[in-house]
Regions:
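Domain-level signal for soluble alpha/beta catalytic cores
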Residues: 1-178, 182-205
Length: 205
């Protein structure tokens, strides 16, 4: 079984090749982008997408979350319009289940879904959407207790995500686990724990 996402015309296989995900369609720290969202300036947003495709991105992240806008409606509009000007697969990036469903409903292909985690409430919101519309879901190795400090703890959360997904008919090939990387300033062992988590994901899950 291979882990594959697609647009209407192009597939991206997650194997040994590094996959470049363009992250410019995201309001975090971008005042012009935030204003474009407030103004419903799709032309500005689409230009960000085209530029990233031209510069070698394999996948485009789409995050239009801003408290003062209608995120579900904006997600639907941006996903629709982006597909008309680029042929890269998209990663739908939102913490809103409603916005996620609006994007999935109009997406032509099999997207990357960002994200779920080990929290029961989050899995109960997102996995039914993945089962209904299809997609490869990013699973963050954290849960109600936060980010585990050890690789073993993160693997336990990863296993919980995989097992819960299976109950919805979602196979492990449609889950990409994110082992999480803490900054060295906040945890001097952070990088070591992340590398050990990645090794265990490869060898045990």
């Amino acid at each position: 079984h291979r882990t594959v996402i697609s647009s209407y015309s192009q597939a991206v296989v997650f194997d040994k090749k590094t996959i470049i995900i363009g992250e410019r369609i995201n309001p975090t720290g971008k005042s012009k982008f935030k204003q474009a969202l407030r103004d419903h300036n799709l032309e500005y947003i689409l230009r960000e997408g085209v530029t990233q495709q031209d510069n070698g991105a394999d996948v485009l992240d789409v995050n239009v979350g801003l408290p003062e806008i209608d995120e579900p409606s904006m997600m639907e509009d941006v996903v629709k319009e982006l597909q008309a000007v680029i042929d890269l697969p998209l990663q739908l990036d939102t913490s809103s289940a409603e916005a996620m469903e609006r994007g999935l409903r109009v997406y032509n292909g099999k997207p990357l879904i960002n994200s779920v985690n080990g929290k029961k409430e989050v899995m109960e919101q997102i996995f039914p959407l993945v089962a209904k519309y299809g997609g490869v879901v990013v699973g963050l190795c954290l849960d109600e207790d936060g980010i585990p400090e050890t690789a073993e703890g993160r693997i336990a959360v990863g296993k919980k995500i995989i097992d819960t997904a299976a109950a919805y008919g979602i196979g492990p090939e449609d889950i990409i686990l994110d082992g999480l990387c803490m900054t060295v300033s906040s945890d001097s062992q952070g990088a070591i724990v992340t590398l050990e988590t990645l090794r265990k994901i490869r060898d045990e899950l």
